[in-house]
A protein has these predicted regions:
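Low-complexity, intrinsically disordered short peptide segments enriched in small/polar/basic residues
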Residues: 9-11, 27, 167
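Bacterial signal peptide processing site
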Residues: 23-25
Length: 230
């Protein structure tokens, strides 16, 4: 099956709940830990995952930072299938699966999680950092463990995710995404390191004023990268 045949398939998206709104700026000073020159927060999550306070390419929590296609480690001017590193001659050349959902789009290697050399967090921040897995973003937005509110930080819209266990929080700015020469605004799209059930798509976290959601998106889309560590 070629890439062009795929676009008749629908995007998977998981229903989200409505967030409370908040218009005031949140300029609180928070004492966070630091490793390899980057701050992180322990939200007391069951997995022990530690979330960075900034995106890759950003120096402040409210900055959007750089945008990365899935399994690419450097930002670029154009995000499209034509510029995607792992598509050659209309076939996927790495992270290719075959399943009941689809036939193969290339040579099957059954890799479903990013290798360190293809992980934007690892390459840019060091070996102790990774992009979150699909399970880790599920945990981050799980109402058992965190509260989520749409708010602003220094004039930038995004979501504040606060631990129910210890009251610590992270802010995810709504920096949009980049694709085919277009860009979106008012929504935050965040990479995971996990391939979807299609070789052409990967899981992501989406946040906006109406709620949050997670689903899958074409691998070539440029998205924000928020690293994690343990």
């Amino acid at each position: 099956m070629t890439v062009s045949k795929f676009f008749a398939l629908a995007t998977i998206f998981v229903a989200a709940f409505t967030l409370g709104s908040c218009s005031k700026d949140d300029d609180e000073e928070v004492n966070n830990s630091k490793a390899d020159g980057h701050e992180y927060v322990d939200l007391g999550l069951p997995s022990g995952t530690l979330w960075a306070t900034c995106n890759v390419g950003a120096s402040k929590p409210e900055e959007f930072g750089s945008y990365f296609a899935w399994a690419e480690t450097q930002p670029k001017e154009m995000y499209s299938w034509g510029t995607y590193k792992w598509l050659q001659d209309n076939e996927i050349t790495r992270y290719c699966i075959s399943s009941d959902f689809e036939s193969s789009y290339g040579t099957v290697d059954d890799k479903t999680e990013l290798l360190p050399e293809d992980d934007a967090a690892t390459v840019n921040w060091g070996n102790n950092w990774r992009l979150p897995s699909f399970e880790q973003i599920n945990e981050l937005v799980n109402g058992k463990y965190t509260n989520i509110e749409w708010t602003t930080l220094n004039g930038v819209s995004g979501v504040k995710i606060t631990s129910k266990k210890n009251g610590k929080s992270v802010f995810l700015p709504a920096g949009g995404d980049r694709y085919d020469g277009f860009s979106s605004e008012g929504v935050g799209y965040y990479l995971t390191r996990t391939l979807s059930i299609s070789s052409l798509r990967a899981y992501y976290l989406c946040v906006d004023s109406g709620g949050w959601g997670y689903g899958d998106i074409s691998r070539y889309f440029g998205q924000s990268a928020r690293p994690v560590r343990k």
